Amino acid sequence: MHKTKSTRKIILVCEDCLSRNYSLNKSNLTQKERLEIKKFCSMCNKHTLHKETR
């Protein structure tokens, strides 16, 4: 019998230029809200807020 996955792959999008720079694995069980992280965007060439897409 196959168990359900406890993690899923998400993509982070830059708020300024809307480029999809990062992909992460997120736990379905512990984190219910959308992820927001300040990371470096290579297109903007600065640190910007990146949000999770669905």
Swiss-Prot record:
Family matches, as InterPro entries: Ribosomal_bL33, Ribosomal_bL33_sf, Ribosomal_zn-bd
SUPFAM superfamilies (UniProt xref): Zn-binding ribosomal proteins
One MF term in the entry's GO annotations: structural constituent of ribosome
Gene3D superfamilies the record matches: Ribosomal protein L33 (2.20.28.120)
Entry keywords, A to Z: Ribonucleoprotein, Ribosomal protein
**Pfam families in the record:** Ribosomal_L33
User: GO terms for CC?
Assistant: cytoplasm; ribonucleoprotein complex; ribosome
Keyword Cell membrane assigned to the entry: answer is: no
The yes or no answer to whether the keyword Cell wall biogenesis/degradation is present is: no
A Gene Ontology biological process noted in the UniProt record is: translation
Which domain of life does the UniProt lineage start with?
A: Bacteria
Q: Which family does it belong to?
A: Belongs to the bacterial ribosomal protein bL33 family.
Q: What is this protein called?
A: Large ribosomal subunit protein bL33A
